[in-house]
Amino acid sequence: ANFRLKFGLIVTLIFFIIGFVVYYVPHVNPFTFNTYPNKLGASAEHWLGTTSMGQDVVWLLIEAIHNSLVIGLIVAVLGTVVGVFVGLLSGFAGGLLDRGLMIVTDTFVVIPSLPILIMMTSLMKGSSTTIVMALVLAMFAWAWPSRQIRSMALSIKERDFIHTAKFSGESTVQIVVTEILPYALTWSLSNFMNATLSAIGSESSLAVLGLSPGNLVSLGNMIQWARSYNAIFNKQYLWIGAPIVATVILFVGLFLLITGYNDYLSMKRGR
């Protein structure tokens, strides 16, 4: 039994239930100011109290989890799909196209992403949305999986069953879809989870620096707002503690899910 895989899956599922099921329970818009009295402590009505702007911390946290997961999923989908496509195309095409694609890919792998992300988010600050933020982060999410998929394609295309498929009259597209893609998708699931984790971490880092969209309720922005309003000095520990604890637990859950899944794949290969 893979404990890490099971535990990570349970933790991740809990966050997805909070972010995509509980989120749609009818409630007051948590971003609206002065909905409730300011700086309330924990109570039966407000489990984690209220902020200095009169917002319910629980619903603010649920909104933040939802938006952070949306950003992570968009980045993971775009990065994985583009990475798999470019990697397979490069690995099977070869020649000049392969060299050209790898030059672009290597450029995106080696250039430092954080300074560019800081510059772009600074330029778009105030006008950015959840989707735009995700698209910016996705710019750097495809390059590494592209290299991995290309290496996989180069290795697999020389195996006997690929040559057999060619001799049997299958086209290149058929071979890629039926023979190569299943291998790529197995690895891509691990990359998908890793990209989700990385995107949430990147957005949180930018938010704490004050560079995430100010109208976006995310885990990072929750921490930034609590810090800006001196939550610690005002002894509003639940306000600043809730997003920090949620971020840590989400990261641990995703990390255990990724490592557990990789161990599972290693066990399958060893059989």
Task: Report the location of each language-model feature.
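Membrane-cytosol interface at the C-terminal ends of specific transmembrane alpha-helices
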Residues: 76, 84, 88, 126-178, ...
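Glycine-rich helix-loop "coupling/hinge" segments at transmembrane-helix boundaries
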Residues: 122-123, 153, 202-242, 246
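C-terminal transmembrane helix and the adjacent membrane-cytosol boundary/short C-terminal tail
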Residues: 126, 140, 193-194, 233-271
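Generic hydrophobic transmembrane alpha-helix motif, especially the helices
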Residues: 47, 57, 91-92, 97-156, ...
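Hydrophobic alpha-helical transmembrane segments of membrane transport/permease proteins
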Residues: 10-52, 207-216
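Alpha-helical membrane-protein architecture signal
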Residues: 50, 58, 62, 97-104, ...
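N-terminal signal-anchor/first transmembrane alpha helix
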Residues: 1-31, 101-104, 174, 184, ...
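Transmembrane alpha-helix signature in integral membrane proteins
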Residues: 57-92
